[in-house]
């Protein structure tokens, strides 16, 4: 019988700790599949965040380091400069990257560090119990915004891809999602392109994944996917925000 689908060698046999319906498992698989298909499993290092993905080093079958909160881009910068032949990437959530780690991600991008960041945007703080994140939508409820986010009080959500795309340093920025099979396929293509551009030494690459958090959104996994399509994506439009390989014909 022909094999239609099998587990990638890029993941260990450790049981994932993520909640049912969480998008991290899907993105982990995509990243691992791309690394395996590129032949980079023995040549990759991931910088793991503080947040729901804090144990990602147990799941990716590659070298990994756990970073201080928000400092994964700084850690990745040091690793890449010392080991430029390695494929180095950070894997971060919206609290780790867009709040406490804003300085690190902005300046790594501005410097054009030859690393890749996989950014999971689910609009909430997952690990700590559902507090409002920099990406929480207007009107969206959180434990620290029980009546819904009020832009007059809490400010507006940060569109990280758009913000970083204004900088000269990034080589490639794309926002994708995983709420449909077609979106998952596109997300995998974006991750592969980000890694390929890093291997070419062209600059900083960034893939934002609009994802889910059914537990802290207080909905079922199915409803969470619907919320992504109906509410998250309209505020965080999918697409390529910067690609110097197209702009410069590389």
Give the predicted meaning of each segment.
Residues 133-200:
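Conserved thiamine diphosphate
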Residues 1-126, 189-193:
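Thiamine diphosphate
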Residues 102-107, 127-141:
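Active-site-proximal loop->helix
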Residues 1-4, 13-14, 199-250:
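Flexible, low-complexity linker and terminal segments
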Residues 50-52, 122-124, 180, 208-216:
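Glycine-rich beta-alpha junction loops
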Residues 62-65, 108, 133-137, 223-226:
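Short, hinge-like loop/turn segments at secondary-structure boundaries
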Residues 14, 40-44, 82-88, 110-116, ...:
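Short coil/turn connectors at secondary-structure junctions
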């Amino acid at each position: 019988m022909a094999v239609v689908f099998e587990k990638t060698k890029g993941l260990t046999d450790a049981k994932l700790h993520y909640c049912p319906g969480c998008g991290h498992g899907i993105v982990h698989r995509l990243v691992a599949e791309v690394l395996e298909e590129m032949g980079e499993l023995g040549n990759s290092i991931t910088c793991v965040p503080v947040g729901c993905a804090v144990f990602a080093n147990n799941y990716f079958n590659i070298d990994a380091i756990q970073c201080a909160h928000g400092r994964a881009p700084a850690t990745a910068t040091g690793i890449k400069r010392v080991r430029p032949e390695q494929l180095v990437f950070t894997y971060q959530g919206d609290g780790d990257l867009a709040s406490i780690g804003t300085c690190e991600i902005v300046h790594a991008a501005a410097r054009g560090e030859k690393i890749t960041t996989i950014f999971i945007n689910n609009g909430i703080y997952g690990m700590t119990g559902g507090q409002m994140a920099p990406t929480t939508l207007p009107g969206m409820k959180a434990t620290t915004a029980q009546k819904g986010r009020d832009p007059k009080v809490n400010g507006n959500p940060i569109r990280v891809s758009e913000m970083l795309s204004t900088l000269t340093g990034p080589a490639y920025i794309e926002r994708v999602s995983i709420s449909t099979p077609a979106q998952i396929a596109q997300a995998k293509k974006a991750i592969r392109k980000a890694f390929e551009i890093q291997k070419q030494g062209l600059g900083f690459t960034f893939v934002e994944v609009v994802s889910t958090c059914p537990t802290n959104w207080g909905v079922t996994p199915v409803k969470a996917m619907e919320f992504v399509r109906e509410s998250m994506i309209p505020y965080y439009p999918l697409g390529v925000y910067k690609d110097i390989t197209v702009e410069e014909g590389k």
